[in-house]
Amino acid sequence: MIPLLVKFPTRQRPDRFRYALNLLVKNMALPGDVHFLFTLDRNDPTVAELMTIINQLCAGTRAGYTIVEGDSTGKINAVNRDLPEFDKPWQSVIVASDDMHATPAWDRWATSAMAEYYPDGDGYVWFGDGFQKDICTIPLMGRAEYDRLGYIYN
């Protein structure tokens, strides 16, 4: 069972992606508890570069990762895409983005928040990004909540 699945869609911003992913990887406290699910668009002209970045930064860690190439119809679709077909069991999922930068032990903080507030996985933790007050741009969701709603982001 994967304690924390990180859903990371990306498109056409390899430099920003590299920076954000490097912070996620470098600041993991529990790499064996983290699995990244990367969503890439097959028509993205930078897809090969993005794959190289992922393999360079993730291969040397204990974190697992899966790369899926496909077709997204927009940002919301890209965030939600690929998760229904992901075949490894997981407890919680958090959305990552190339404009959000991880702080030290971000993964421990996320798993601790879920354990404290929704130990049964039936809930959603609202993390503010410092910019939006009315939109949850960094959703963290338990599996039971995801199964009920059928999406992470809308």
Where do the model's predicted regions map?
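Short, acidic, metal-binding catalytic loop of nucleotide-sugar glycosyltransferases
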Residues: 22-33
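Active-site nucleotide-sugar/metal-binding loop of Leloir-type enzymes
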Residues: 80-92
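Short beta-strand/loop segment that forms part of the nucleotide-sugar
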Residues: 32-45, 67-70
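A short, glycine-/small-residue-rich helix N-cap motif at loop->alpha-helix starts
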Residues: 70-78
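Short beta-strand-to-loop acidic/aromatic patch adjacent to the donor-nucleotide binding site
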Residues: 90-101
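Aromatic-glycine-rich donor-binding/catalytic loop that engages nucleotide-sugar donors
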Residues: 143-154
